[in-house]
Amino acid sequence: MNGMTDQMKDLIGMLPTAPTTYAQLVYNSELLDYQAEQVLLMGDSLTQISPEQMHIKVIDANRAALEAGAQSAMIGYKQLLLNEESLESGLTLLNAVYQSTQNQAANGLATQSQVLSARQQLESTQATKLTLTANEQKLRQTLCTMLGWKYDAVPEIRDVPAADLARIDGMNPEKDKQAAQDNNFTIRYNVLDLDNKDAGSVEYQNLQRTIKQEKEEVSSSLVNLYNDVLQKRNELQTAKAAYELEKTKMETAERKWQLGTIGRLEYMQQQNSLKTKEIAVKTGDLALFQAMETYDWAVKGNLKLSQ
């Protein structure tokens, strides 16, 4: 009995955790930021805002935010699809566990409590799958409307490009910080705003200090974003190594299965483990691609500052 319970825990423990709607949160955040920018603009005195400032605030900053938000939503959509694929593999395994537990219970080798536990795990994962599918459909509709389609359109959504490791070689926070500072929308706006202040006034001096602090924040943020890229690269390499090891285990399981030296559940467990490692590689690739895009967007000026 205890062996069966332990086996079930091992099998269930290999299933993926419930995913988050990361891309939806990103998109909502970008949309709220866009609306906030409009409110801030309305609160300013229009007589003190130059056409260049208005263009930066209304056009440049919001365009970049929406483009970056659409990219993040696309990446998040692909992540949801990967999570669905992982759940499908997990459901296949859990269904087999449930059927096996029922059979063992019929032969007096498992308790009704164990049967109930297996069924609850299966039903819980099925419910998660339904929620995930609903989130995927909602996010697809969001993507369609963001990109100019009707919400119920069915355009082909292709894969996100694979992360190009060569891009990392071209990243250098020390060299890129000048461009990031010069391009930053907040800094550009405030630099132009200096023209509206009386040189030597308290407001002028305060704004000068603010701009200096903002430039320092850009520099430190760029270093953090670069470090995140490196971390995501390491995580991807680790995931790839784990996947290669799991493929070797799968080959061994294949031979044992053909020889009849392992049971069906053990074989399915190895299949699910391989699928989990495969999806971890794809997830790591998406995460690295997102990290590189975030760094590049910061260099282009799309970096929110705390000032």
Predicted regions and their residues:
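Short, solvent-exposed, mixed-charge loop/turn linkers that connect secondary-structure elements
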Residues: 133-175, 292-307
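Polar, low-complexity export/assembly segments characteristic of proteins
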Residues: 177-181
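Long, non-membrane, amphipathic alpha-helices that form coiled-coils
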Residues: 52-55, 59-62, 80, 84-87, ...
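Charged, solvent-exposed structural "stalk/scaffold" segments
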Residues: 44, 69, 76-131, 234-282, ...
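Short flexible linkers and secondary-structure junctions
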Residues: 1-72
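Sec/SRP-type N-terminal targeting helices
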Residues: 33-58, 113, 117, 186-244, ...
